[in-house]
Amino acid sequence: MATKRSVGTLGEADLKGKKVFVRADLNVPLDDAQKITDDTRIRASIPTIKYLLEKGAKVILASHLGRPKGVTPKFSLKPLVARLSELLGLEVVMAPDCIGEEVEKLAAALPDGGVLLLENVRFYKEEEKNDPEFAKKLASVADLYVNDAFGTAHRAHASTEGVTKFLRPSVAGFLMQKELDYLVGAVANPKKPFAAIVGGSKVSSKIGVIESLLAKVDILILGGGMIFTFYKAQGLAVGKSLVEEDKLELATSLIETAKSKGVKLLLPTDVVVADKFAADAESKIVPATAIPDGWMGLDVGPDSIKTFAEALDTTKTVIWNGPMGVFEFEKFAAGTDAIAKQLAELTGKGVTTIIGGGDSVAAVEKAGLADKMSHISTGGGASLELLEGKPLPGVLALDEA
């Protein structure tokens, strides 16, 4: 993907008095009392908004929240106003809608250095259909466009792709820029040796990533529930562990590809097995070659952790996507925690560590090590698609640098 123009290239002359449509990813979790339980995404969007305000722009902020079917009060962005205002040190104005006369009035009345938060863009089905008329209405209140929502960059929606046809310049925000620099940079031009750790329960959801990474990495470490499909493909007994029967041939061919490309492929040599899928299950450590009948593997074992650690110690770049085990259960979190701790240590030694979205991010945050990594990706699906080498519509739509 070609390099995209960044918001940092716009100065006061470009921004003062201009209305800037900023698509952020403010899709934060809310509890039943509509309180924000994790404001990471809001905080991540602040640098771009502050930069625009300092240059005298008027910011029109748009986001989705959840997956509403039509107007759904519990998916309103209203609960975000107080936290946004607090972080920006000004009073954010809330619009009752994201298009229409009322929004036009509020946008027209916005002073330089003011912020208007539009209501959830997904209250309209036209958003996800990328309807050009809807995109035109969204764009009509602004002069230019900044996309800082990496988490939805893999979707061609009205607020991520459609609006760029009506607003120029259309540029990447700082968060989007950082994601692209790290994820595209890591894949296109990594410091070697380059390792990828891929976990998660299903091979099927990670096939594209594994195939794409096999062409680029020196070491590939596999963990999580997907390993049992690989074991079974190699003729091992896996007890009651999760297996995707229709992916056995694929697992065999991935092992062959790794061999032919000279990639060191590491599968766990021992696993923590349980008698049931529960936090309080009976558990024991067994070699991968001796998983007993009626037991299921829920984490990688201590020998595997040691082998993985030795391999990772040789690296200069590491990408991690997907947990090593069922880390939601304390008993089966050791493998995932060990990887998180080791990557934090490696970062301190100058290794580039990239946590590629999804559950690995949750695992790193649970371990309190988020600020110890080089880069934590905010995109789940978007990170995966980028690592798979797929073009992202929300990025393609932005101006070339």
Swiss-Prot record:
UniProt subcellular location: Cytoplasm
SUPFAM superfamilies in the cross-refs: Phosphoglycerate kinase
A GO MF label: ADP binding
Primary residence: cytoplasm
Binding annotation for Mg(2+): D359
Binding annotation for CDP: G200, G224, G322, F327
Sequence positions that bind ATP: K206, G225, G297, E328, D359, S360
Residues where ADP binds: G200, G224, F327
Chain sites annotated for binding AMP: K202, K206, G225, G297, E328
GO BP: gluconeogenesis; glycolytic process
Any Pfam family matching the protein: PGK
PROSITE patterns per the UniProt record, alphabetical: PGLYCERATE_KINASE
GO cellular component: cytosol
Keywords: ATP-binding, Cytoplasm, Glycolysis, Kinase, Magnesium, Metal-binding, Nucleotide-binding, Transferase
Catalytic activity: (2R)-3-phosphoglycerate + ATP = (2R)-3-phospho-glyceroyl phosphate + ADP
EC number: 2.7.2.3
Protein's pathway: Carbohydrate degradation; glycolysis; pyruvate from D-glyceraldehyde 3-phosphate: step 2/5
Amino-acid positions noted as binding (2R)-3-phosphoglycerate in the UniProt annotation, renumbered to this chain: A24, D25, N27, R41, S63, H64, G66, R67, R122, H154, R155
InterPro entries per record: Phosphoglycerate_kinase (IPR001576), Phosphoglycerate_kinase_CS (IPR015911), Phosphoglycerate_kinase_N (IPR015824), Phosphoglycerate_kinase_sf (IPR036043)
HAMAP family referenced in this protein's UniProt entry, alphabetically: Phosphoglyc_kinase (MF_00145)
Family: Belongs to the phosphoglycerate kinase family.
Protein name: Phosphoglycerate kinase, cytosolic
Origin species: Triticum aestivum
